[in-house]
C-alpha cells in the first residue's frame, strides 16, 4: 500500500479528488497541517463523492509530527518528495510498497528546508521548460536576457511563482500540473512498478 502525503494543501476539491484516487488504489492519505480548509468542507466531500467515508486518512499537526508518527527520518528512503526543483524524474525512481509520495501545497510546494534536508529524495514530473510552455515565452526570454539573468539566478527566480512559472502581471499563465493530476501520475507509476497489487 502506498501513502500519499499532502503538505499544507489549500484547495479542498484537489484533496477530495486525491482522496477518491487513494480509495480506488488502496493508498492511505496523510494531510500535514496547516490545511487551507476544514475536512468538513462540503467541497472536499463532494470531490471525493461517495468514496470519502472509505478513505484511510490521517491528519498531522506538522511535518515533525508526520515523521515521528510514521517512524520516518527527514531523508528516509521511503520518502519521495515531488517538486519542480528536482533533477531526477519520478520515472527514474524505484518505488516499493509502503513508500510515501509527498506533494506540497498548490501555491508554494514543499518548503525549501524540507527539500534541502532530503535532496536525494526529490523527484519531478517532466514538463516543458516554463518559458517554452507559455504563450508569452519569447517575450519573457527576451526580458530575462535583457536583465542579464539566467533561469537560475536569484532575480529570475523572484519573478517566478513557486512552481517556476514566469509571472507577468499583465499576461499571467500557468504551466504547472494540477496537484490532483500530479498525484495520480506518480501514484500510478508506483503501482505499475509494483505490479498493480490487488487490482
Model-found features: residue ranges?
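Post-transcriptional modification and biogenesis factors for structured RNAs
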Residues: 1-199
Amino acid at each position: 500500500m502506498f501513502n500519499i502525503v499532502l503538505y499544507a494543501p489549500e484547495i479542498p476539491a484537489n484533496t477530495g479528488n486525491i482522496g477518491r484516487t487513494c480509495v480506488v488504489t488502496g493508498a492511505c492519505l496523510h494531510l500535514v497541517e496547516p490545511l487551507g480548509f476544514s475536512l468538513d468542507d462540503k467541497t472536499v466531500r463532494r470531490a471525493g463523492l461517495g468514496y470519502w467515508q472509505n478513505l484511510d486518512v490521517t491528519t498531522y499537526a506538522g511535518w515533525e509530527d508526520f515523521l515521528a508518527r510514521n517512524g520516518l527520518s527527514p531523508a528516509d528512503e521511503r520518502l519521495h518528495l515531488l517538486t519542480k526543483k528536482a533533477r531526477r524524474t519520478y520515472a527514474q525512481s524505484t518505488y516499493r510498497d509502503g513508500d510515501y509520495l509527498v506533494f506540497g501545497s498548490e501555491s508554494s510546494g514543499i518548503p525549501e528546508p524540507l527539500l534541502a534536508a532530503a535532496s536525494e529524495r526529490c523527484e519531478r514530473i517532466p514538463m516543458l521548460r516554463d518559458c517554452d510552455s507559455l504563450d508569452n515565452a519569447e517575450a519573457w526570454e527576451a526580458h530575462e536576457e535583457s536583465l542579464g539573468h539566467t533561469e537560475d539566478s536569484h532575480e529570475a527566480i523572484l519573478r517566478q511563482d513557486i512552481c517556476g512559472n514566469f509571472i507577468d502581471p499583465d499576461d499571467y499563465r500557468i504551466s504547472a500540473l494540477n496537484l490532483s493530476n500530479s498525484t495520480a501520475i506518480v501514484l500510478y507509476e508506483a503501482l505499475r512498478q509494483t505490479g498493480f497489487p490487488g487490482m
